Every structure is written in structure tokens, then in C-alpha cells.
UniProtKB/Swiss-Prot annotation:
Belongs to the bacterial histone-like protein family. This is Integration host factor subunit alpha. The lineage of its organism: Bacteria, Pseudomonadati, Myxococcota, Myxococcia, Myxococcales. The gene is ihfA. NCBIfam families: himA (TIGR00987), PRK00285.1 (NF001401). Coiled coil: none annotated. HAMAP family: IHF_alpha (MF_00380). It comes from Anaeromyxobacter sp. (strain Fw109-5).
Length: 99
């Protein structure tokens, strides 16, 4: 599903104009992005948590040459689905066979 698909879904289900639906979806994504950039956790009840984690620098190895290289510190984004979402996914697997 793309952002355009999400906008279309909001347009169809809520009854806003396509322009209004697009603005709302953009605002939601902007808010999520800004919150994560500040390093804050996002908790969406019944869906899951987006968490920014700090990774320390470490020594790694180039798989082609075997040479040791320094991997710099960085921030990574993780997602932990809620139990509600996990259960919904498992139920939908029972109803619809995977393609």
C-alpha cells in the first residue's frame, strides 16, 4: 500500500475531498516524522510502537575482503506490533490463504 492508496482510502471511508484527505494524511505522517526525529516513542493503541534506538559505533568486517572497518554510531527505527495487531494478522491468515 502506498501513501496514495492511504489517501484514497481516507477519501472513500471518511467522505472528505481528495485534497482534504491528502492534507490530513500528510499532517499525520509529518507529525510522526517530527516526533521520531526528536527521538520520542510513538505508541498507537491496538497497532504498535515506533521506537528510535541509539546504536553505538562498533568494529565490523568487510565480508568481501575480511578487513576490519569502523561502523559509526547511528539511530535506527524499530517497530513493535501490538498483540491486537499480531492476533488480527494470524486470524486473517486463517481466513485467507497466502498468495
Amino acid at each position: 500500500m502506498t501513501k496514495a492508496d492511504i489517501i484514497e482510502s481516507v477519501y472513500e471511508k471518511v467522505g472528505f475531498s481528495k485534497k482534504e484527505a491528502a492534507e490530513i494524511v500528510e499532517m499525520v505522517f509529518d507529525t510522526i516524522k517530527e516526533t521520531l526525529e526528536r527521538g520520542e516513542k510513538i505508541k498507537i493503541s491496538g497497532f504498535g510502537n515506533f521506537i528510535v534506538r541509539e546504536k553505538k559505533s562498533r568494529v565490523g568486517r568487510n565480508p568481501q575482503t575480511g578487513e576490519e572497518i569502523e561502523i559509526s554510531a547511528r539511530r535506527v527505527l524499530t517497530f513493535r506490533p501490538s498483540q491486537v495487531l499480531k492476533n488480527a494478522l494470524n486470524l486473517s491468515d486463517m481466513v485467507q490463504p497466502p498468495v
